[in-house]
A protein has these predicted regions:
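C-terminal transmembrane helix pair
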Residues: 54-140
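Transmembrane helical segments that form the transport core of multi-pass membrane transport proteins
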Residues: 1-70
Length: 140
């Protein structure tokens, strides 16, 4: 985790030369998910940024970022953002899964390594679908 955070800091330092950072890039890459969840305006970019932070770093850092923005969001948007961040699907958890399951079954480590990325993507979509259900329920 410390390595990922350090790598992100180095990349942000480099992108700072172009007046960019990874959070803004993630905000625009993952903004369509925020739009599909029924968020609007500034909330869409915030949701994209949070999803990107969750995927690249981890959910705790994304929740910390969300806590700084809760005053700006209405209750529905806050619930949608919080539910979309619940889950264990991020890059650091891929390594944990390979390491922990690989110890239990060392001869299948190559299969686990091949499938863990698909499992992470599935976990991201499950979190987004859970947030979509919250979005639908709280429309009324």
């Amino acid at each position: 985790l410390v390595g990922f955070i350090g790598a992100v800091a180095v990349i942000n330092r480099f992108l700072g030369l172009f007046n960019l950072n990874l959070e803004h890039i993630f905000g625009y890459l993952f903004a369509p998910f925020g739009f599909l969840l029924g968020l609007d305006g500034k909330e869409v970019l915030l949701e994209g940024t949070l999803l990107g932070n969750k995927l690249i770093l981890n959910e705790f850092i994304a929740f910390g970022e969300l806590s700084t923005h809760l005053g700006e969001l209405d209750a529905r948007a806050g619930m949608i953002c919080a539910i979309s961040l619940c889950g264990f699907a991020n890059l650091s958890s891929m390594g944990m899964c390979i390491g922990s399951i690989g110890v239990l079954c060392p001869e299948k480590r190559s299969v686990i390594s091949r499938l863990v990325f698909r499992a992470m993507i599935g976990g991201v979509f499950v979190s987004i679908l859970s947030a979509l259900l919250v979005s639908i329920v709280f429309l009324f």
